[in-house]
Amino acid sequence: MGEHRLARSAFLWGLSGIYLFAFVSLYVQIPGLYGREGILPAWKMLRFTGKGFWEQMKDSPSLLWFGPRLGLDTEMTMELICLLGALLSLGALLFSCLRDSLVFLLLWVFYLSLYQVGQVFLYFQWDSLLLETGFLAILVAPLHAMRWKTSVWSAHDGVTFWLTRWLLFRLMFASGVVKLTSRCPTWWGLTALTYHYETQCIPNPAAWYAHQLPVWLQKFSVVATFFIEIGVPWLFFLPFRRLRLFSFYSQVLLQILIIITGNYNFFNLLTIVLCCSMLDDQHIAFFQRHKKTQHKGGIATSAFSLRSLVSLLEIPIFGLLVFWTVKYFDLQINWDKHSLESRTAFTYHDFQQWLRTITFPSIWIAAASLGWEILKGMYRSASVRGFFWKLWSTLQWLMFSCAAAAMFTISLVPYTYMDFESNGQLWPEVHQMFNTVDRYQLVNSYGLFRRMTGVGGRPEVVVEGSFDRETWTEIEFMYKPGNISTIPTVIVPHQPRLDWQMWFAALSHHSHSPWFASFVYRLLQGNKDVIHLVQNDESLYPFHANPPTYIRAQQYKYWFTEVDQSGHMPKSWWRRRHVEEFFPAVFLDDPFLDNLLSQHGLKDKPPARRSLDAPIPFVLKLIRDFLHPLPAPLLLHSFIFGIFTIYFLQAMFGGVSRPSVAKQRHSMPPNEKKKQKPNSGQGESASSKSSGHGTDTVRRNKKNEKS
């Protein structure tokens, strides 16, 4: 594969945007979720236990411990961290000089600090994925402080960037595997998508239309999902460029389709950012028009022969993937029904045996791929000119290669969770290494949509309030389904964490969601910050004048409406049926409610509020008051619009800064030096015929210096 400079720059740029979305989205929800009188107050997670300050920092690494020293309570410290994180990530998004290792270290520390007190509202896989990706960015990003006066493309950059590809492999492969290891009948029956669109956490309007697609197409979509998540990731580590590009576009296609049909915050965008690890500079430069090549006969004869040989290997590999997909999912065209029929043609035992067989070979394949990147880095270090620079490059290569090997090693523990027999065969030292760093969320296990919920109807909790216990009024949420006539919302990349947890709460008894009792308690109190999570516009909240005397919750089953046989569109988006009472009617000082709150310490008296007269609390309050009326999706979409407007104006007026190719200190082989002697026109022609495999680095740099 070719160089990764532009791909790495795209990865760091995209991750900066993801951090911005994550910090801003969480910031607007802090008072209601984690405030002194929020649903799950964060101050409860930072109680001093008699241990020393640094010992508590070690047990729960978080910058929030420094809040009291700044005169801030826990809530305001969280707001400060979110604002600093948003400002820093916005700067990294707009200015390439800020896409530095130290900047990404700060962003990672900021998000980890929030994660430590986030409790159930931050325990999502994409939060763990962002932390792991963010830590890898510290290794991937350039450290300008160590590069002094020149921007040197370090020999180790390919090694550290490889870790993002390994993370993407683990994410996608595990997401496909767990769907089958869970024994979920909808995944095995290929009918999961006939339920998915209406049962996902927060559907959008496109989900309603996707739900109307014919069953045979839904089943084929499940087969395609398995193909992309289980089969295609094996191509990530093969030395064939076109197969990797195919992998890139297939993964991106899947993520875009999920974005179109669902509200999954920044998760799919983050996955697309990880897909940059499969790109090379030649492919990115093609779209940026860095290369205007006109290949002429004679010069490309040997390259053509090499491409032909590579194609002879690529075609059978791709053909095998298609063949196995057709065979094991029994794909057949039904000409009479004009459809494509499919079924699972293997058993759970067959799949478990296959998984057990390939788990360790997949590790060795990945290890060989990493080893190849390390060897390439060693060769580049040896090619650096000058004894001092060669020594410096070698030391960096050695340090980052060891770091990459360590990250790869500890990631094997969560990776092998999908097959516990393989997990048990790992060396005890590997488990010990993982347990040592587990608190920092450096590596995690993944596996999305393990089981398809909502078979037989989407469970939904509807909260109701009353003044007299006779007349009940439903409390509508901004994002989750409630009123059957309300159109589903589009809120990407925002994640309304209360609405998401309401979806999880509906899947089981209320006792499995202790936070729900606290939520009801705050509504009975008329807590403005918690109400703001339910309705940003208080006038739409039915009890904005006076809090309700009683609150209860009912459980319903929801289904998408369908187009009738005549093709007429229904008037409502949903239909629903009452199932049972989810939470009994309670009031303030109700013994049942008090008992639930006391069991989980949710009625403890908060610490005294700190003064707002100090400069930092005063500024934080001003910012909060200014942003409070804005809905979170509007705020995030404004950021997106503003950023792209800036880039558009820069492009229009010629001020856009493209990712540059760093100057090299690598010496050229003798045959390369001979090719530099002809005139400049010939030199440019030669450099334009880059094969994308890193053989013409110096010539490409010469061309960039001229332009």
UniProtKB/Swiss-Prot annotation:
InterPro entries: LMF (IPR009613). One of its GO terms (cellular component) is endoplasmic reticulum membrane. One of its GO terms (biological process) is protein maturation. The lineage of its organism: Eukaryota, Metazoa, Chordata, Craniata, Vertebrata. Belongs to the lipase maturation factor family. It is found in: Endoplasmic reticulum membrane. The chain crosses the membrane at residues 10-30, 78-98, 102-122, 126-146, 158-178, 220-240, 256-276, 309-329, 358-378, 395-415, 634-654. Residues 680-694 have a biased composition (Low complexity). Glycans are attached at N483. Residues 661-707 are annotated as: Disordered. It comes from the Eukaryota. It comes from Xenopus laevis (African clawed frog). It is a multi-pass membrane protein. Residues 696-707 have a biased composition (Basic and acidic residues). The gene is lmf2. The keyword DNA repair does not apply. Involved in the maturation of specific proteins in the endoplasmic reticulum. This is Lipase maturation factor 2. Keywords: Endoplasmic reticulum, Glycoprotein, Membrane, Transmembrane, Transmembrane helix. Its main location: endoplasmic reticulum.
